[in-house]
Design a protein with these regions (language model features):
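Short, Lys/Arg-rich amphipathic alpha-helical interaction segments
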Residues: 91-138
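General nucleic-acid-binding
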Residues: 1-54
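Short, Lys/Arg-enriched anionic-surface-contact patches
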Residues: 55-78
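Generic alpha-helix initiation/capping and coil-helix boundary signal
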Residues: 41, 53-56, 78, 98-99, ...
Length: 138
């Protein structure tokens, strides 16, 4: 990713956590090297300039979007990791501690995700095909 608007937009819309985190990390690297460059010796500024040349320029608003997208993607996958932890013998209290929430909140989060998975999929191919089969009969 070279930092142009199209590649940043593509990363943010990709659903690929690694691409999204790269946008976030590039912003933070750029900020860090700019701070170093502003306060260092000539040698430090030269080193910072070298590193800045290799980091994609990411706007603060793009970084905020990347942050929000990363949180969304990670939270969406949390239920699966909770399932793995439970299967490995973790208690709800341990899971809650790992997440920084209560055991009840961890249990409630997992329950809500399971309920979402049980909802009918509006793009259920089998249901769509069943309608075609019904049409053949009529």
């Amino acid at each position: 990713m070279n930092g142009d608007a199209a590649s940043v937009e593509q990363a943010l819309n990709s659903g690929d956590i690694h691409a999204v985190l790269k946008v976030w990390e590039d912003f933070n690297r750029g900020e860090t090297w700019r701070e170093v460059s502003a306060s260092g010796s000539d040698q430090v500024r030269a080193s910072a300039a070298h590193f800045l040349a290799e980091v994609s320029e990411i706007a603060a608003l793009e970084a905020l979007r990347a942050n929000a997208k990363a949180v969304e993607l990670l939270t969406a996958r949390r239920w699966y990791v909770i399932k793995s932890a439970r299967e490995a013998g973790a208690t709800w209290a341990q899971i809650g501690d790992a997440l920084g929430i209560t055991k009840q909140a961890a249990h409630d989060f997992y329950s809500r995700k399971i309920e979402e998975l049980e909802k009918p999929n509006p793009h259920d191919v089998a249901a769509a095909r069943a309608v075609l089969e019904d049409a053949k009969e009529n």
